[in-house]
C-alpha cells in the first residue's frame, strides 16, 4: 500500500494517476453506458472517479472525490 493524500495524488499526470490506481487502487464501483465507462476506486482513505470515453477509447478523467455527495452521485448514476 502507498501512503498518499488527495492533494499529492492531484500532482500526478493523468498517466501517473492511472498507474497508481493500477498498482494500489481497489475498484469499488463500475458502470458502463453505451458511450462511457465509470469506475470509482478506493486509494488509501479517499476515492477516485475514473471516466473513460468508449468511442474514443481514452480516459477523460481520473480525479479524487472530495465530498460524500460526489461519491453518492457516482453510485446513483
Describe these PLM feature segments:
Residues 1-77:
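Polybasic/polar functional segments that serve as interface/processing modules
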Amino acid at each position: 500500500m502507498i501512503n498518499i493524500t488527495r492533494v499529492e495524488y492531484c500532482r500526478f499526470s493523468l498517466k501517473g494517476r492511472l498507474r497508481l490506481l493500477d498498482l494500489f487502487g481497489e475498484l469499488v464501483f463500475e458502470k458502463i453506458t453505451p458511450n462511457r465507462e465509470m469506475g470509482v476506486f478506493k486509494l488509501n482513505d479517499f476515492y477516485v472517479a475514473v471516466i473513460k470515453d468508449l468511442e474514443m477509447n481514452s480516459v477523460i478523467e481520473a480525479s479524487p472525490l472530495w465530498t460524500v455527495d460526489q461519491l453518492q452521485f457516482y453510485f446513483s448514476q
